[in-house]
Amino acid sequence: MPRKGPAPKRPVVADPVYGSPVVSQLVNKILLDGKKGLAERIVYDALEGVSSKSGNDAVATLKKALDNIRPTLEVRSRRVGGSTYQVPVEVKPHRANTLALRWLTSYAKGRREKTMTERLANEILDASNGLGAAVKRREDTHKMAESNKAFAHYRW
């Protein structure tokens, strides 16, 4: 454990094309094996596809999709007297954003379209319309928190 306290959060650098830190974070989530150029090409092509299909600004559509995916509650395991309870807790904004990006990319990878660009574009469009697997994941997370509301007094 560090003696100087927690490491400070580094600021997210905005990406050069759209000037948005959210797009930069999405590129870093898509990134595999250090191939950042490939990840950028996938994200930028997907955002172009989003803007051509929806007719709206791509970054605005992405932010709307992330708002629809971002969870407000989640459950965390808490051990009390030999039994483990799933305790609902509020999600901090930074973690909510991270979870939204993680779910968006993971469910885009699991889609059936031919290229990753198409998968990501269609998942962003579905999420912005309140559909898709990533939005369903948020609903399931909220449902778990709702069903375990009885254990909310174990919060820490």
From Swiss-Prot:
Q: Which GO terms describe its biological process?
A: translation
Keyword terms, alphabetized: Ribonucleoprotein, Ribosomal protein, RNA-binding, rRNA-binding, tRNA-binding
- SUPFAM superfamilies for the chain: Ribosomal protein S7
Q: Which domain of life is it from?
A: Bacteria
Q: Does the keyword Membrane apply?
A: no
The family annotation for this protein states: Belongs to the universal ribosomal protein uS7 family.
Q: How does it assemble?
A: Part of the 30S ribosomal subunit. Contacts proteins S9 and S11.
Q: What is this protein called?
A: Small ribosomal subunit protein uS7
What is the primary gene name for this protein? rpsG
